[in-house]
Amino acid sequence: MSRNFYADEGAFVGSSKGPLLPDILHTEDVSTKTLPTGNQIYDSKALDSWFSGIRKYVTHKYYIYKTELDTQKSAAANEWKSVQDYVSQHVLTDDYEKQELLVPSSALALGAFFTGRVLSNRRNWGFDSPLNTTKAGILTRNPSALGRVLTSIPSRVLLPWVLTGTVLSQLTPVTWNNSVKALEQDVLPADLVARYHEIWNQLLVDGVQKTSASVHRNVDASLQQGIGEVRRYLVKKLDL
């Protein structure tokens, strides 16, 4: 026969008055809230205050960084707008070049830049060739004088940019001149620009152009002298 627990005389029923709180809790630090269902929620005031402080701190920092980010984004947008306005007013002043020549000339300038990189690459002139050794015998491949000039450090630095500038100056001369003028006036220091023009005048105006003019005068004088001698010779021979 099964046992009937309700018939036990020694059964003990504990008290159910009020909530059972551990002795470790201090009731003055715990707030109680009763739900409509009759359940009670216990909340530690210390933990609630601590989490509230953390939440306020994180929220405060978030708004600070968000405001700073929005400010930087606005400043960057204003700077970009200023650059666009400056370029439109001082560089891209020729409508025909801007609408018809800017894109193709930029593509050709990019090709000129990489052409300069190829021409100044040591590998393309045999410096790294396996035949560039004395063991190759009659097959020894030595770089030419032109290759040594084009692969020098100044050429490797300047040649790509010189070719790029040459293409742009020939295809879009107005835009190129405006770019150089804007660079000299608003970007580079005035002392550097003055020194650059001085060196340019010494090398080009006082050097190359004067030498070219002198050679032209000498050649012209020689031609005129030669033509005069031929005329005198013909007059003498023909008894004119």
Curated annotation (Swiss-Prot):
Spans through the membrane: 101-119, 157-176
Which regions face the Mitochondrial intermembrane side of the membrane? 1-100, 177-240
Protein keywords = Membrane, Mitochondrion, Mitochondrion inner membrane, Transmembrane, Transmembrane helix
Disulfide linkages recorded for this protein, renumbered to the chain, are none
Q: Which residues lie on this side of the membrane: Mitochondrial matrix?
A: 120-156
GO CC terms, sorted: mitochondrial inner membrane
Q: Does the keyword Membrane apply?
A: yes
Question: Does this UniProt record's set of keywords contain Transmembrane helix?
Answer: yes
What is the topology of this protein in the membrane according to its UniProt annotation?
Multi-pass membrane protein
Localization per Swiss-Prot or TrEMBL = Mitochondrion inner membrane
Hey, which family's this protein in?
Belongs to the apolipoprotein O/MICOS complex subunit Mic27 family.
Q: What does this protein do?
A: Component of the MICOS complex, a large protein complex of the mitochondrial inner membrane that plays crucial roles in the maintenance of crista junctions, inner membrane architecture, and formation of contact sites to the outer membrane.
Oligomeric state and interaction partners are given as: Component of the mitochondrial contact site and cristae organizing system (MICOS) complex.
Q: What's the name of the protein?
A: MICOS complex subunit MIC27
Name the lineage. Eukaryota, Fungi, Dikarya, Ascomycota, Saccharomycotina
